[in-house]
Amino acid sequence: MIGQEQLQTEIQKQIKRGVFPRFCILVGPRGAGKKLLAEQVSKWLNATLLPTGTSIADIRVMIENSHKLSGNCVHLISDADNMSVQARNALLKVTEEPPNNSYFIMTLEDENNTLDTIRSRATIFTMDRYRPKEIREYIEKKFTDITKDRVSTISIYTTLCETPGEVNLLNSMGALEFYEYCDKVVQNIAKVSTSNSFKIADKVSLKDGQEGYDLKLFLKAFVTICFDEVIAINDPENLEMGLYAQMALKTDEYLRELRNKSVNKQMLMDNWIMEIRDIWM
């Protein structure tokens, strides 16, 4: 596992002292390695890892099994940001008095995406941010075809990717082709007709399971390219420099909005296109 040394050390210390919590929440961005860390924790505890879903039915089955199973078990509730209120309420019951042989680990991208009462009963572990050096180390270990002499390609990864999981995602999309497309959008979004501008969304995945470029990475690339234009122009009196800066700042607002897991991505994309075009009008 790349990085997370301090967090791993802290968890191991708690396990050795016999004070590791029966219920904890791992918080971190997508692809940060939360599930991988949970797998590692189960090994340190000499426990069986039992992944479960987030539906009310899944939680009820998990609770029932937790009282029946013998031996140490780690029940892993992954990607629980969108868990229903009913499922969260069911989870409350078992986290209040966990069975002696059961540990419960929930993973979230944002700790606010669950009930206050659940947070109050859990020990929260926050994944450390990955440094560019660690992202580069991961790239060079996992993708041998991205060699050190391809500096431009590696810089795309280290600029856009916050986690190893995002490196995998960007690689699956084709980093260079993706970045070239984003640059094309930056240069032409205000020049094409309104109807053609909305075709930008055809290349972006706006629903789970839909093919296309990842929306978060697309917006991050757009911001990066806009700021590169600002640096290249480097003339405060140049009107375009200010417009590129406005596009970057406006897009960053949409990136923050995207953190809301219930956001309508299609609506967000349409609104973003209109606001970016308005900047140039």
Language-model segments: what does each one mean?
Residues 1-99:
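Clamp-loader machinery-focused feature within the broader ASCE/P-loop NTPase space
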Residues 91, 100-102, 118-121:
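AAA+/SF3 P-loop NTPase mechanochemical coupling elements
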Residues 63-64, 83, 107-108, 241-245:
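Short hydrophobic/aromatic-rich motifs at helix boundaries and adjacent loops
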Residues 1-33, 37-46, 110-221, 225, ...:
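Charged, glycine-rich active-site and insertion segments that engage polyanionic ligands
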